């Protein structure tokens, strides 16, 4: 007994539209504890869609379709489904009435081609669309097979899923067990290194632990399958706490917590402020810090010191040091951090200077070399050398630089 997602639309195959519907539905199925092993994207082609239905209907009990429900000629999902199951389409007057009301409320005239949206296979139930004009269907064309169709518009699909599909599935006995997960987030450690530290947890069966990696960050998803969220939390908590203990400072937060929100919380708790001086990131660090609502409580501002003259005039960087060591150096990073801290009167000053590329690198200072400077309220100033590699593009280096600088600040805040 499993579900399968079928997303219909040539625009998805061409990459013109991000397929966020499949991501949403996959998460929802996991949350409901409904097994889900396959997803398919197929273009607006009846014969290929029939092939997909043939395969999916022989391996899944619930087929969930998105897309292809509109009034245009390429909207073929409903009629293809009906044709596959040799069932006639029947016009539903209640759908016509609903569409007429919606068009009138919007001050528009309903054209004849919209009547196509009122055609459903004989015996199918209407899956109401509160937001749009294209309803879906809820149908059991044969025993042990349920079909649900949704528009491709994400807002409409989500509303229909939440208001109609979920209650139906639960009423049918699906979703008696839920899968509840907590995502633990780590920085400053690679996926393989973290996996080696916590490898014994990968053999657990309930909860399970699975690693994921993204740019500059590693995550561990701890998931439990139980009858209630409370039971799941009771299983997850001790495992999550042990993982955090093993990781130490490499662990920074969980679920929706971001590095910026965690740093902001610590600064707010301590009643401290921070300012930034940026060169190669050109405001990237300030942007990350201010992505958190209420960041004005602790973020005073920043100086983008891209040109060396700005480093000297606004941050007080020694011109002789610039000449001797270059802008990309530990001593300049330290002076930038101290300079912005003093200039803006904050407890902490953070600086970034480096070679983002693709040009500008040398044998001694290659693309990807970045220095992060930190100055604290106790007068201590230090810097950290980061080498992100010559193979990474400019935006990756800039992003890694901003988040690495923020993570250095987090660690210093926690140990001071």
From Swiss-Prot:
It comes from Rippkaea orientalis (strain PCC 8801 / RF-1). This is CinA-like protein. SUPFAM superfamilies: CinA-like, Molybdenum cofactor biosynthesis proteins. Gene3D superfamilies: 3.30.70.2860, CinA-like (3.90.950.20), MoaB/Mog-like domain (3.40.980.10). InterPro entries: CinA (IPR050101), CinA-like_C (IPR036653), CinA_C (IPR008136), CinA_KH (IPR041424), Competence-induced_CinA (IPR008135), MoaB/Mog-like_dom_sf (IPR036425), MoaB/Mog_dom (IPR001453). Belongs to the CinA family. It holds the Pfam family CinA_KH.
């Amino acid at each position: 007994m499993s579900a399968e997602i079928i997303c219909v639309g040539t625009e998805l195959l061409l990459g013109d539209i991000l397929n966020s519907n499949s991501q949403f539905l996959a998460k929802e199925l996991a949350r409901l504890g409904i097994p889900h092993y396959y997803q398919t994207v197929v273009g607006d082609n009846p014969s290929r869609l029939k092939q997909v239905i043939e395969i999916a209907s022989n391996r899944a009990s619930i087929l969930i379709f998105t897309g292809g429900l509109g009034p245009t000629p390429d909207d073929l999902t409903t009629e293809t489904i009906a044709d596959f199951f040799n069932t006639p389409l029947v016009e539903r007057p209640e759908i016509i009435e609903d569409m007429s009301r919606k068009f009138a409320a919007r001050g528009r005239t309903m054209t004849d081609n919209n009547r196509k949206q009122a055609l459903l296979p004989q015996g199918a139930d209407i899956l109401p669309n509160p937001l749009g004009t294209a309803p879906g269907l809820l149908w059991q064309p044969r025993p042990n097979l349920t079909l649900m169709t949704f528009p491709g518009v994400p807002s409409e699909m989500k509303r229909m899923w939440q208001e109609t599909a979920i209650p139906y599935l639960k009423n049918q006995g699906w979703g008696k067990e839920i899968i509840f997960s907590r995502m633990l987030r780590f920085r400053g450690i690679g996926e393989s290194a973290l996996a080696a530290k916590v490898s014994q947890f990968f053999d657990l069966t309930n909860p399970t632990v699975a690693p994921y990696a993204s740019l500059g960050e590693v995550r561990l998803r701890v998931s439990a399958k139980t009858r209630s969220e409370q039971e799941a939390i009771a299983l997850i908590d001790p495992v999550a706490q042990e993982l955090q203990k093993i990781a130490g400072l490499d662990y920074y937060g969980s679920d929706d917590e971001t590095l910026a929100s965690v740093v902001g919380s610590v600064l707010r708790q301590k009643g401290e402020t921070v300012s930034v001086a940026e060169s190669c990131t050109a405001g990237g660090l300030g942007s990350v810090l201010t992505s958190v609502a209420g960041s004005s409580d602790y973020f005073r501002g920043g100086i983008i010191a891209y040109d060396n003259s700005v480093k000297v005039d606004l941050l007080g960087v020694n011109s002789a040091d610039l000449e001797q060591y270059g802008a990309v150096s530990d001593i300049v990073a330290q002076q930038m951090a101290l300079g912005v801290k003093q200039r803006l009167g904050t407890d902490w000053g953070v600086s970034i200077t480096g070679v983002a590329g693709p040009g500008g690198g040398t044998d001694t200072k290659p693309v990807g070399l970045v220095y992060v400077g930190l100055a604290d309220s106790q007068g201590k100033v230090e810097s950290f050398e980061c080498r992100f590699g010559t193979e990474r593009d400019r935006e990756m280096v800039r992003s890694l630089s901003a988040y690495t600088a923020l993570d250095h600040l987090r660690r210093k805040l926690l140990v001071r």
